[in-house]
Amino acid sequence: MDDYSIAGNHGHVPVMRDRMAALIADHVREMGDRAVIVDATLGAGGHAEHFLTVFPEAHVIGLDRDENALRDAGERLARFGDRFLGVKTRFDGLSQVLATGEGDILDLARKEGISGALFDLGVSSMQLDQVERGFAYRTDAPLDMRMDPTQGITAADILNTYSHGDIARVLKTYGDERFAGKIASAVLKEREKEPFTTSARLVELLYDTIPAATRRTGGHPAKRTFQALRVEVNRELESLSNVLPQITDALNVGGRAVFMSYQSHEDKLVKRFFTELTTSKTPPGLPVDLPGTAPRFRQVTRGAETASEAEIEENPRAAPVKVRAIERIAEHTENTEN
């Protein structure tokens, strides 16, 4: 990854970029100039840039809800001309974009289907590095956390308006926070004094609320709460649930969709959906699949792939990633590749 240093890559080293390209490479190259790749989480454009470079005939559609990301990535990818198209949307707007979007690349996608797709889930490195967005808990900033800063509720809105039960649910469900109820009680007590506006006050509350023994062994006490608030603000699991059937419907035969998850709840959702799609609907006990019951997809990865030690050393943000890929098939074949 020598040519993708952080300093020369807009502050963002694309996680496992070579492996992401390898997972979709065979079919994309086979499709040639008919290949359309969807980078559904464009961010700084690192993965899209790599795809456009290593697949010189392919076209890329980049999706992002953040206008700033689209602008910066568009400038970065301008040298690829009409092989790249950026679209402002949450990634579960994919089906709408493919159905009604305008442009030669979208016309090609409607005609040929999607040959490869990447979903790099969670907050982008670029957003983490923008202090004013409020994603990071180590620097005081407004409690925003919106991936699209022009619409939707903020993290402050959640803390200042949600009930005790709803705050506890968010922290427990999306952050696996053991002390969700205790934190929710502290939030309600503190907001009676003054509404929450900045991250420093929330971090201070978490230090005061989470027991010292847990703080010593469980990592930064704000990590789980900030993660949970971000997921709620951006409706991340809802978006993921919505887009899974959208992308699998859009793949052409041989096309692959790759998902990079950084949290257990994301990976479990992807795993469950992939298992359902790759399981025969023939009743148990029959020797062959009945017509129309054979799976139309196969899992490409054996379980979830993880980043190598070398990758993590180069790019520490790759440490928690889990990668799963699925391929549309014409007829039933073996369920995983060797």
From Swiss-Prot:
Uppermost EC category: transferase
One Pfam short name: Methyltransf_5
Record keyword Signal present: no
Main localization (coarse): cytoplasm
Gene3D superfamilies, sorted: Putative methyltransferase TM0872, insert domain, Vaccinia Virus protein VP39
GO biological process, any: rRNA base methylation
Catalytic reaction annotation: cytidine(1402) in 16S rRNA + S-adenosyl-L-methionine = N(4)-methylcytidine(1402) in 16S rRNA + S-adenosyl-L-homocysteine + H(+)
Known role: Specifically methylates the N4 position of cytidine in position 1402 (C1402) of 16S rRNA.
Family annotation (PANTHER family): 12S RRNA N4-METHYLCYTIDINE METHYLTRANSFERASE (PTHR11265:SF0), S-ADENOSYL-METHYLTRANSFERASE MRAW (PTHR11265)
Protein name (database record): Ribosomal RNA small subunit methyltransferase H
Provenance organism: Corynebacterium efficiens (strain DSM 44549 / YS-314 / AJ 12310 / JCM 11189 / NBRC 100395)
Gene encoding the protein: rsmH
